[in-house]
């Protein structure tokens, strides 16, 4: 299929360019992350759901304290926070686990630059649906049964470094709206639509709307 060939070509070119940029800033970001709090440079987070539900490890610079995801689910002092996390579409507007450096790299989306590696490996695309956590999809579909058809559709496409959710408010939009947008993208995806989203991503990143 011509679209698949062109999209993969665009992904390879774009990811190689992104990896060059990543290589230039990596020493500085790595130093800042390590200086901000003890722990690894890359986030140690659960795997994400990729195309057809296949799980993969998504690379991100660590923006939180070490073992942040494990602590959220197991530490008693985070119990109320975990309930808020699930209720708020697996996002927190004021997350005490985020480090000072983490706030900056999340606001500027620098933490997501390592995902160019996922794109080059073919696990992600430059443009696509959000990369959801498997338990997020399970729990949210239980809470909102009407979203099941959208989840099924969005999983037919590779998750993206950017996508309709990125240019439509990011964390400001609900799970229901997010999966509708992602399913709509999966249905009408095209190279022109991908290029449009890439262009719209620039002002979205500059505005930092919905970034937490």
Identify the residue ranges that each predicted region occupies.
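Hydrophobic structural segments characteristic of membrane proteins
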Residues: 41, 114-212
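Glycosyltransferase donor-binding loop in the core domain
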Residues: 20, 105-108, 156
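Short, glycine-rich, amphipathic interfacial segments at transmembrane boundaries or analogous
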Residues: 41-96, 162-176
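A hydrophobic, helix-centered structural microdomain
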Residues: 1-71, 187-212
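Structured, soluble extracytoplasmic/luminal domains of envelope-associated proteins
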Residues: 95-127
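Positions in alpha-helical segments
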Residues: 15, 44, 99-103, 181
């Amino acid at each position: 299929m011509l679209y698949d060939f062109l999209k993969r070509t665009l992904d390879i070119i774009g990811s190689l360019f992104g990896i060059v940029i990543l290589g230039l800033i990596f020493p500085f970001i790595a130093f800042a992350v390590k200086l901000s709090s003890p722990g690894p440079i890359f986030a140690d987070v659960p795997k994400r759901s990729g195309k057809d539900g296949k799980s993969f490890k998504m690379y991100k610079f660590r923006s939180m304290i070490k073992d942040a995801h494990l602590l959220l689910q197991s530490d008693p002092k985070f119990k109320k926070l975990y309930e808020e996390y699930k209720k708020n579409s697996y996002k927190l507007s004021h997350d005490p686990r985020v480090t000072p450096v983490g706030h900056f790299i999340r606001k500027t989306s620098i933490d997501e630059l390592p995902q160019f590696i996922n794109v080059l490996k073919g696990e992600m695309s430059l443009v696509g649906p959000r990369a959801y956590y498997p338990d997020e999809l399970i729990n949210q579909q239980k809470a909102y049964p009407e979203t099941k058809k959208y989840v099924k559709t969005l999983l037919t496409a590779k998750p993206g470094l950017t996508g309709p959710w990125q240019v439509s408010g990011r964390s400001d939009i609900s799970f229901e709206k997010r999966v509708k947008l992602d399913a709509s993208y999966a249905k009408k995806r095209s190279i022109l639509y991908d290029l449009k989203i890439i262009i719209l991503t620039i002002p979205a990143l500059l505005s930092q709307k919905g970034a937490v």
